[in-house]
Amino acid sequence: MEAVPEKKKKVAAALGTLKKKKVPAVPETLKKKRRNFAELKVKRLRKKFALKTLRKARRKLIYEKAKHYHKEYRQMYRTEIRMARMARKAGNFYVPAEPKLAFVIRIRGINGVSPKVRKVLQLLRLRQIFNGTFVKLNKASVNMLRIVEPYIAWGYPNLKSVNELIYKRGYGKINKKRIALTDNSLVARSLGKFGIICMEDLIHEIYTVGKRFKEANNFLWPFKLSSPRGGMKKKTTHFVEGGDAGNREDQINRLIRRMN
């Protein structure tokens, strides 16, 4: 019976020694490391939240812009229809406004051509066969197109053609490299300072030939189109004579469909 109190005494003594032992202090370097890690984590979370908020705001802005542009395009189309109806009702002909935008496709090589033609093709950025570019129409550009007319097919693209070309074949010139336009951020990074932050902005600027057309068009790499389905008829003959070269006005849209 005396063994039990003896056992209790031993346990009590062991507990006493444990209480007397001091817990080793956490080193200052470890404390500092933990504190820095906690601060870094807070900063990272704040940055992540700020970026998320910014992306959300930008997505909303892009959606609103796309909606506005869609309304604008529809209004332009309805105005054209209304004007044509009014003219027809009055027994007149409606003459639409002069086109401001052209799409130019190179259809021939330049073997044995004059240096002047070669230079104009370089200015139009048509360095390879089946390359295509947008051109703002004015007196100077029309004269350039006339010089190289036997080597190009050109006309007036509609909204659908501009849309499909940029979305399907669109590449941007970023740091002198040809980069596929797979994200709005690529457009915003290069053209954000001009108020062009998304693909819809880019399409609108090109189609309407806006104030920043030059910057938007120079950002776009020349389009590399496929050989037209069904082939070409006669490259050396003008379109009005049954060939492929020269101005085909709104019929360029059919050629774009065959090559896109």
UniProtKB/Swiss-Prot annotation:
The record's gene field reads Rpl7
**What keywords does the record list, in alphabetical order?**
Acetylation, Cytoplasm, Phosphoprotein, Repeat, Ribonucleoprotein, Ribosomal protein, RNA-binding
Question: Entry's CDD domains?
Answer: Ribosomal_L7_archeal_euk
Any one annotated GO CC term = ribonucleoprotein complex
The annotated subunit structure for this chain is: Component of the large ribosomal subunit. Homodimer. Interacts with DHX33.
NCBIfam families to which the protein is assigned, alphabetical: uL30_euk
State the protein's name: Large ribosomal subunit protein uL30
Q: What is its main location?
A: cytoplasm
Whereabouts are the sequence repeats?
A: 7-18, 19-30, 31-42, 43-54, 55-66
| SUPFAM superfamilies named among the record's database cross-references | Ribosomal protein L30p/L7e
Q: Which residues carry this modification: N6-acetyllysine?
A: K136
Write out the GO biological process terms.
Answer: liver regeneration; maturation of LSU-rRNA from tricistronic rRNA transcript (SSU-rRNA, 5.8S rRNA, LSU-rRNA); ribosomal large subunit biogenesis; rRNA processing
Family per similarity comment: Belongs to the universal ribosomal protein uL30 family.
Which residues in this protein are found as Phosphothreonine?
T29
Q: Where is this region: 5 X 12 AA tandem repeats?
A: 7-66
What species is given as this protein's source? Rattus norvegicus (Rat)
Modified positions (Phosphotyrosine) in chain numbering: Y151
